[in-house]
């Protein structure tokens, strides 16, 4: 004869969640964690740190309007190329102003 367990099942009857399921759900829906740290001395605010953490998939982040990695030269080769192209054009224009006859026009790619 079996006796029923006295401890409840933490996930409910017949439900189980493994790490992959939890991670998939978090990345699909997204999670925001926010917190502030303030250091005061005699009612004088010395330091305030505001923490904001968003955990989401790239697709979900883009859906929310977060795409800073696409324009950050440290993270995107396309952004670095665009930045260098703009800088090159500005330098060519400056050279043209200084010595109009010496700098050739940019060739079309």
UniProtKB/Swiss-Prot annotation:
Main localization, broad class: other
PROSITE patterns: GAS_VESICLE_A_1
One Pfam family matching this protein: Gas_vesicle
GO CC terms of this entry: gas vesicle; vesicle membrane
Keywords: Gas vesicle
Expression induction: Constitutively transcribed at low levels, repressed by argR.
Entry's Gene Ontology molecular function annotations: structural molecule activity
Subcellular location: Gas vesicle
Superkingdom of origin: Bacteria
Function: A minor component of the gas vesicle, might be involved in nucleating gas vesicle formation. Gas vesicles (GV) are hollow, gas filled proteinaceous nanostructures. It is not clear what function GVs perform in soil bacteria.
Subunit structure: Interacts with GvpA.
Stated family: Belongs to the gas vesicle GvpA family.
Protein name (record): Probable gas vesicle protein J1
Organism of provenance: Streptomyces coelicolor (strain ATCC BAA-471 / A3(2) / M145)
């Amino acid at each position: 004869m079996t006796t029923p367990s006295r401890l409840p099942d933490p996930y409910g009857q017949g439900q189980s969640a493994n790490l992959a399921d939890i991670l998939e759900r978090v990345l699909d829906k997204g999670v925001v964690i926010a917190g502030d740290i303030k250091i005061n001395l005699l009612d004088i605010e010395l330091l305030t740190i505001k923490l904001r953490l968003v955990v989401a998939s790239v697709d979900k982040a883009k859906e929310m309007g977060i795409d800073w990695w696409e324009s950050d030269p440290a993270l995107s080769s396309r952004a670095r190329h665009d930045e260098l192209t703009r800088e090159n054009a500005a330098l060519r224009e400056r050279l043209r102003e200084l010595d109009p006859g010496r700098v050739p026009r940019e060739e079309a790619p």
